[in-house]
Amino acid sequence: MAVISKVTYSLYDQKEINATDIIISHVKNDDDIGTVKDGRLGAMDGALCKTCGKTELECFGHWGKVSIYKTHIVKPEFISEIIRLLNHICIHCGLLRSREPYSDDINLKELSGHALRRLKDKILSKKKSCWNSECMQPYQKITFSKKKVCFVNKLDDINVPNSLIYQKLISIHEKFWPLLEIHQYPANLFYTDYFPIPPLIIRPAISFWIDSIPKETNELTYLLGMIVKNCNLNADEQVIQKAVIEYDDIKIISNNTSSINLSYITSGKNNMIRSYIVARRKDQTARSVIGPSTSITVNEVGMPAYIRNTLTEKIFVNAFTVDKVKQLLASNQVKFYFNKRLNQLTRIRQGKFIKNKIHLLPGDWVEVAVQEYTSIIFGRQPSLHRYNVIASSIRATEGDTIKISPGIANSQNADFDGDEEWMILEQNPKAVIEQSILMYPTTLLKHDIHGAPVYGSIQDEIVAAYSLFRIQDLCLDEVLNILGKYGRKFDPKGKCKFSGKDIYTYLIGEKINYPGLLKDGEIIANDVDSNFVVAMRHLSLAGLLSDHKSNVEGINFIIKSSYVFKRYLSIYGFGVTFKDLRPNSTFTNKLEAINVEKIELIKEAYAKYLNDVRDGKIVPLSKALEADYVESMLSNLTNLNIREIEEHMRQTLIDDPDNNLLKMAKAGYKVNPTELMYILGTYGQQRIDGEPAETRVLGRVLPYYLPDSKDPEGRGYILNSLTKGLTGSQYYFSMLVARSQSTDIVCETSRTGTLARKIIKKMEDMVVDGYGQVVIGNTLIKYAANYTKILGSVCKPVDLIYPDESMTWYLEISALWNKIKQGFVYSQKQKLAKKTLAPFNFLVFVKPTTEDNAIKVKDLYDMIHNVIDDVREKYFFTVSNIDFMEYIFLTHLNPSRIRITKETAITIFEKFYEKLNYTLGGGTPIGIISAQVLSEKFTQQALSSFHTTEKSGAVKQKLGFNEFNNLTNLSKNKTEIITLVSDDISKLQSVKINFEFVCLGELNPNITLRKETDRYVVDIIVNRLYIKRAEITELVVEYMIERFISFSVIVKEWGMETFIEDEDNIRFTVYLNFVEPEELNLSKFMMVLPGAANKGKISKFKIPISDYTGYDDFNQTKKLNKMTVELMNLKELGSFDLENVNVYPGVWNTYDIFGIEAAREYLCEAMLNTYGEGFDYLYQPCDLLASLLCASYEPESVNKFKFGAASTLKRATFGDNKALLNAALHKKSEPINDNSSCHFFSKVPNIGTGYYKYFIDLGLLMRMERKLSDKISSQKIKEMEETEDF
């Protein structure tokens, strides 16, 4: 098949429709001939096509036609285009609407774009009546009536026939088409002689109901039948037009969107492009439950017999395979044989005689049952990133389930509680070769962004790793027994006694070093915990090995160590019983007694406070503050439990060092004090979205408590532990949380999946070019991919070492730090980075040496400086800043920290050049990689708990998925959260007083009303403590009341006085007369007074000012005050004195003030902050996405392709159902370069292995051959001369 490089879209013209021979003229027929189910329209349901005689796999269908007897039917999707054109011409005479007469001798093709626009404005400017002296009629506005289903004159609602519109549009001369933006003959907007009947392939038979009658057909077929029926009856134009609209897109005339029609093919979630082209059902697939197997390695997958016997693989006949194929035929293992010349597939059964069908010529193929060691793709859904779908070697296993190595369970997010996986056997040899390299677990060992191994030990293996390291005094036999099949090459080196450390040294097998962890391949750490053996840890031994050598050594370590850990467990055993957890009831009884005592004290203190408030002894706290105090007391109780458990664990470890449960805790597996607290201490406060359950009927959550009870246990504090068991009410509270979590998970899965798809579609065409830059099409996004022009999986986060006077080269390091430090103090100066990005893990090559053997200090500095200068010029073309790399080498290789030899230094920099030269290839799909990593992380996060920043009643800066979603959607005209930071609190207080919402009701006023002879008197007594607590003054309260009354339209006359009642209270007396009806208006006034007398912006949030320690540098901090406020626009801050106040606006305000680059930086940091702590490594993908969203002059949402030339097919696969229609209307021509278009046209996309074009220059080979023959002949002559001389 030829490679398609360009595609042009256009509308079918009538000649193409008329050209088909298949005439549909019947509604029903016995054998369906001449109906919309005619067998000539294509092959269906196993029946061969009656036109071409092919099967449904080979026949793409044929079009039919139905006569519409010279009626003009508008193509429904282009009704708006026809109306647009009619707005530019006179419906009476057909000439263009114009302010002044125009001549037809202008040549529009010669005009520039600017001149054409000026002519458009001049000619197409509106006027009331036609300029044509023979017409002079007023211009008519034509619209489409949904009710009448035809075009009508808007003025008098009189029908305008389609034939008249058709005549007027086709009479527009071609030379005026550019003026009206017509791209093809306007007749193509209509059906005239025949209406096309689409092939059967797009309307497979399905069961559905119409008017309570079951139909075994397709809705499209049914709708086509209605069109044929109306055409046969020679119905009116409107009737046929309505039938065509119902078939094409019923939304045009009706809001009933439930029925399926032609527009469904390109719109909605299950459109045909997505279901049949972007992804589709495949043959040779299997699905089964998964289970673990100890006998297979990370690179293998176990397949049960019933799958092996069902799936078949192809073997193509060629000179290399013909003998093997003959053997397979002879041994009766071939299931199918395909003869290419006869185009015939033969099923081979035992005892069946086959004559003259098997020729075994090149191009033929046979199908045999899948064999061991064949590469097969398998994966677990949801496939959030590429580690979910891998290609491993098939191994035969017992039982009925697919078996996987426990080492890959983490990367596939799989456990063995009934999870299922799917597998697909690719048939194309090219695909098999590609998958066996690119999707092989060894290739995928290290995470694309994080750089740590994605495979590692799980569960019991972690405990085994910990216990094995601690074991002592093993004899050689015991060591060999533990090592099993890997013990053959173990060298005792003359020793009789061995420890677990020796076993690890043998398993590592390389003279590898790492500060504080490894020395010459020996572990120097105190313990081996989970950080050394599990996946996604930077200290993983497998990761360090692969950094030192290659992924092959890393995977081998995982395979060998996993085997050894399992053997250790099977020999020495390991088990945890309830007795390990709770040897006796002493500790739990003690904890229970403490908890009961403390909760009674809390309840007592709370009850005393409530009684004192009721008796008027004290002024009550605000609701938010009261809840905070109760919560802090309950948190103290929870923390007390955790402290007691930690002390208990410490004591148990002294008394019983072999306690298996504590071994697990020390190994970093499963057990932590919080989990133990739930089991042994208290189950704690149950929360929904971070808050205790809200009270419902009668001011309570459950009927177990008194109405309006303030009992903390009545709001979801569960005192009992799981060991003691929960009471009925406690169980209901725990289930209340479970219910909200399950609904959250269901909803969030869908929302995150939708956003993930959008981000991947947005970023899929972003690749690394041959210069290590990131590009999308021809647009440059980043100068340096991954900042280092090295593959993301090779880069490594390392500790950021701050300048110190004890360092060698301190002045140089300080100067560098001052240049780069801005990037490391982030998040409104609240955070200081602890890690930075190294171009590769050079620490595994750092071998300490003595002072005598070490490289000279100046030589090392010169070497670092020269390498960085060389790299800056040759690899980064002095465009990108790589000071951070120089800083890393100067600090980590600093002679004051470590002395190294010259050879070690040379090795490190040779490796540096090697990584720069060979790791990051052109075509690396960095966009898809980044999109997948971001999506996988925010999906995991949305499914775990939601977290927020502020605890008090302030604007909660939502973290997690919700905020990420808002940032990527970039909605305009919404309030943005603005953060103000200053060391001068008074400047923030002035903003707070003006913006914070306070109403009279919040001040707990005592309001009384009395009627005097000619007026009403309202007394408002407020305790001054409430005024102080709201951080306002008595004057502000007076202003609030005064402002409300002065603006009130129901008050006729008013006056006001303020009195100091006593030292605690202040009284505002208001004198009022109301407009008629007086009684009603008085009632209204008194009803709204507590809420309507207010100040600030109406909001349910307060604006607290919090203080924090801000970083100016790694060693310079200062106290800063911060507050967040919701504003539409920064102009609202214009009247305040904000000198020396840092204002952090939202994304649109940032863009409006500082421009697109500032918006990009804001978006990047804001997106990263939504992930919370520990996800700094996501900076690169966040930066890439932010750079893409801000690639044009304005930030663009992930939902749109407004900027940049997104292809029609990309828009169509993304969900724009109008993309193909618009492309056809405007006769667009597009190159096939992007991912979506390549997918559609079976072209290899320009990413990954498809980035480079491979070809062989035969001329070069001929020249090389000539040179070689000349060289050989001259060498022979030389040899002969030497022989003669001898």
UniProtKB/Swiss-Prot annotation:
Which terms under GO biological process does the entry name?
DNA-templated transcription
- EC number, as in UniProt: 2.7.7.6
Q: Per its UniProt entry, what is the enzyme's top EC class, as one word?
A: transferase
> Where is it localised?
Virion
Which gene name belongs to this protein?
Answer: OPG105
What this chain does, per the entry, is described as: Part of the DNA-dependent RNA polymerase which catalyzes the transcription of viral DNA into RNA using the four ribonucleoside triphosphates as substrates. Responsible for the transcription of early, intermediate and late genes. DNA-dependent RNA polymerase associates with the early transcription factor (ETF), itself composed of OPG118 and OPG133, thereby allowing the early genes transcription. Late transcription, and probably also intermediate transcription, require newly synthesized RNA polymerase.
Record-level GO cellular component terms = DNA-directed RNA polymerase complex; virion component
Name the reaction it catalyses: RNA(n) + a ribonucleoside 5'-triphosphate = RNA(n+1) + diphosphate
Q: What keyword terms does UniProt attach to this protein?
A: DNA-directed RNA polymerase, Nucleotidyltransferase, Transcription, Transferase, Virion
Name of this chain's protein: DNA-directed RNA polymerase 147 kDa polypeptide
Q: What is its main location?
A: virion
Q: Which family is this sequence assigned to?
A: Belongs to the poxviridae DNA-directed RNA polymerase 147 kDa subunit family.
Subunit structure, interactors included: The DNA-dependent RNA polymerase used for intermediate and late genes expression consists of eight subunits Rpo30/OPG66, Rpo7/OPG90, Rpo22/OPG103, Rpo147/OPG105, Rpo18/OPG119, Rpo19/OPG131, Rpo132/OPG151 and Rpo35/OPG156. The same holoenzyme, with the addition of the transcription-specificity factor OPG109, is used for early gene expression.
PANTHER family according to UniProt: DNA-DIRECTED RNA POLYMERASE (PTHR19376), DNA-DIRECTED RNA POLYMERASE III SUBUNIT RPC1 (PTHR19376:SF32)
Q: Name one GO molecular function term.
A: DNA-directed RNA polymerase activity
Which InterPro entries does the entry link to?
A: DNA-dir_RpoC_beta_prime, RNA_pol_asu, RNA_pol_N, RNA_pol_Rpb1_1, RNA_pol_Rpb1_3, RNA_pol_Rpb1_4, RNA_pol_Rpb1_5, RNA_pol_Rpb1_clamp_domain
Q: Return the Pfam families for the record.
A: RNA_pol_Rpb1_1, RNA_pol_Rpb1_2, RNA_pol_Rpb1_3, RNA_pol_Rpb1_4, RNA_pol_Rpb1_5
